[in-house]
Structures are given as C-alpha cells and as structure tokens.
Amino acid sequence: MNVKIQDLKDVTISGVKTLCTKSLDPYKETFFEWTAFPMTVDFKSTQIACGLLEGWHHTPAFDEIEYHADAELFYFLEGPAVMLFVDIKDGKAVMDSAQMVRIPAGTELSIDAGKGHFVAVA
C-alpha cells in the first residue's frame, strides 16, 4: 500500500492534537532559555514514564503499528520525522484511514488512547 507523505501543517489527524512550540515565546535569562510544552493531557494512569528517542537517517520502513490503552505525548526536539497514523477497530488497523505525516522539529503531539501510530526516524 502506498500512502503519500504529507506535511503536518497540511493535514488534520483524528485523535491527535498538535502544537508547534516554535510559535511560543521562550522565557529568557542571561544563561538560559526555556520553552514550555504547554499541552495538557488527561492520563488514565498516575504512573507516567518519559524517554528520549534518538535516530539516524535511513529509508523509513513501516511494518508495525502501535497503540495504547492510555494517551501518549511526543516532543520532537529535532526533525523532521515521518509518522504513520491509522485508526484501530477491533484491534486491527483500518488501512483506509492511514496517514503518513512529516513532523517538523519543535512539534508537540498528543495521541489519544487507541490511536494507531508509529514513528520512523528519517
């Protein structure tokens, strides 16, 4: 199946909220600059884990999809990255809903529980 890669600014993704942090004014002092990630998300769990994904340029391949019982946040510090989004019904991907989206650096994403997604660092 071929899916056209589209820029985030040109699409709407059901179940995904986006924010470009580059549009926010950072707080500045003499020796640092701080930019908030102001998107808030209601999680089902109070046990929240965070991590940093670092990748290297390659030809992206999408042979899996993931989804979760809780919401998920992504912060793209560098970019671009290519992400696959797809609706899930009865535990299976609804391929007619597939979207390939180019995510620029400085983007914050909130992905609803149950929304299929996968990031390929490209």
Describe the predicted segments one by one.
Residues 1-102, 119-122:
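Active-site region of the double-stranded beta-helix
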Residues 107-118:
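Histidine-centered metal-chelating micro-motifs
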